[in-house]
């Protein structure tokens, strides 16, 4: 099928001007995820904040009740017993100076990064590498911790980090098209709840302004914000 015809087909039945209840929006997106691979279901939340101001930054981490469907590679900066704990918990890459050297050389073989507090002076050297990728360990979201086993299991088990972008948007994957619709709805509501709880002191007016759901290759469907709470 030609790309133009394919796009026309998957867009049929979606009113671009309408705000759909969350459960209906998810159903529409799932029905149109027709690629040969299991598409990721993504959510975009527009917030009434200006992240250029420190008191309007929004970030956090949420454990999705039904996981993400992704295989997440976890890297841990730790030594001694904590390194052993990380390996036992299923971390894919564990190290100290050796791991720093790997990352500096451009070998980043992980998707999420965790560090013990004593490692941060060393890990701090990697700010220019990990920072732009949103992978720098941060105590505010539980990735600088002595509980490395818990952090590794959380990252592997469906925890999602979120951070508002320059345009005031949070984007996150919340599951796969193969998930049951009700499980995707539960995940989206869990994300929205976490975003609400992370509302900064400097936010004024309507906080969650717009919500949209889409699949990797599909069109976005606008959601009535009141139905995600």
Curated annotation (Swiss-Prot):
PROSITE patterns noted in UniProt: RIBOSOMAL_L1
Domain of life, source organism: Bacteria
A family per Pfam: Ribosomal_L1
GO-annotated cellular components: cytosolic large ribosomal subunit
Keyword match Ribonucleoprotein: yes
Any GO BP annotation: translation
One Gene Ontology term of the molecular function aspect: tRNA binding
Gene3D superfamilies reported in the protein's UniProt record: 3.30.190.20, 3.40.50.790
Transmembrane segments: none
Record key words, sorted: Repressor, Ribonucleoprotein, Ribosomal protein, RNA-binding, rRNA-binding, Translation regulation, tRNA-binding
PANTHER family (alphabetical): 54S RIBOSOMAL PROTEIN L1, MITOCHONDRIAL, LARGE RIBOSOMAL SUBUNIT PROTEIN UL1M
Quaternary structure (record): Part of the 50S ribosomal subunit.
Function: Binds directly to 23S rRNA. The L1 stalk is quite mobile in the ribosome, and is involved in E site tRNA release. Protein L1 is also a translational repressor protein, it controls the translation of the L11 operon by binding to its mRNA.
UniProt family annotation: Belongs to the universal ribosomal protein uL1 family.
UniProt-recorded name of the protein: Large ribosomal subunit protein uL1
Originating organism: Rhodopseudomonas palustris (strain ATCC BAA-98 / CGA009)
Gene name tied to this protein: rplA
